[in-house]
Amino acid sequence: MSSGGLLLLLGLLTLWTELTPVSSKNRPPFCNLLPEPGRCNAIVRAFYYNSRLRKCLEFPYGGCGGNANNFKTIDECQRTCAG
C-alpha cells in the first residue's frame, strides 16, 4: 500500500474513533445482548438496550430467567447502557 493510502486509512480510523460515542466504549457487554423473555409465562413490562438503534426499547418479559439486558424502567436502562 502506498504511503498516501496508509495516511488516508490512518485518517479514517482516527475520525471513526473520534466520532464513536465515549459511552459505547464503556458500555457493559450485556447491553449488546438481544432481549430474552425468559422461561415463565407472565407478561411483565421490561426494557432492553438495542445496540443497533442505540436506545432502550420495551419488550414483554416472562417474569423469570432471561439475561442481564433487562431493566424494570427505561431510566435504569438508559443510565446503564445508553449513558
From Swiss-Prot:
<dbReference type="InterPro" id="IPR020901">
    <property type="entry name" value="Prtase_inh_Kunz-CS"/>
</dbReference>
<feature type="site" description="Reactive bond for chymotrypsin">
    <location>
        <begin position="41"/>
        <end position="42"/>
    </location>
</feature>
<feature type="disulfide bond">
    <location>
        <begin position="31"/>
        <end position="81"/>
    </location>
</feature>
<feature type="domain" description="BPTI/Kunitz inhibitor">
    <location>
        <begin position="31"/>
        <end position="81"/>
    </location>
</feature>
<feature type="disulfide bond">
    <location>
        <begin position="40"/>
        <end position="64"/>
    </location>
</feature>
<feature type="disulfide bond">
    <location>
        <begin position="56"/>
        <end position="77"/>
    </location>
</feature>
<protein>
    <recommendedName>
        <fullName>Kunitz-type serine protease inhibitor C</fullName>
    </recommendedName>
</protein>
<feature type="signal peptide">
    <location>
        <begin position="1"/>
        <end position="24"/>
    </location>
</feature>
<dbReference type="Pfam" id="PF00014">
    <property type="entry name" value="Kunitz_BPTI"/>
</dbReference>
<dbReference type="InterPro" id="IPR036880">
    <property type="entry name" value="Kunitz_BPTI_sf"/>
</dbReference>
<dbReference type="GO" id="GO:0004867">
    <property type="term" value="F:serine-type endopeptidase inhibitor activity"/>
</dbReference>
<dbReference type="GO" id="GO:0005615">
    <property type="term" value="C:extracellular space"/>
</dbReference>
<comment type="function">
    <text>Serine protease inhibitor.</text>
</comment>
<keyword id="KW-0646">Protease inhibitor</keyword>
<keyword id="KW-0964">Secreted</keyword>
<dbReference type="InterPro" id="IPR002223">
    <property type="entry name" value="Kunitz_BPTI"/>
</dbReference>
<keyword id="KW-0732">Signal</keyword>
<keyword id="KW-1015">Disulfide bond</keyword>
<keyword id="KW-0722">Serine protease inhibitor</keyword>
<dbReference type="InterPro" id="IPR050098">
    <property type="entry name" value="TFPI/VKTCI-like"/>
</dbReference>
<comment type="similarity">
    <text>Belongs to the venom Kunitz-type family.</text>
</comment>
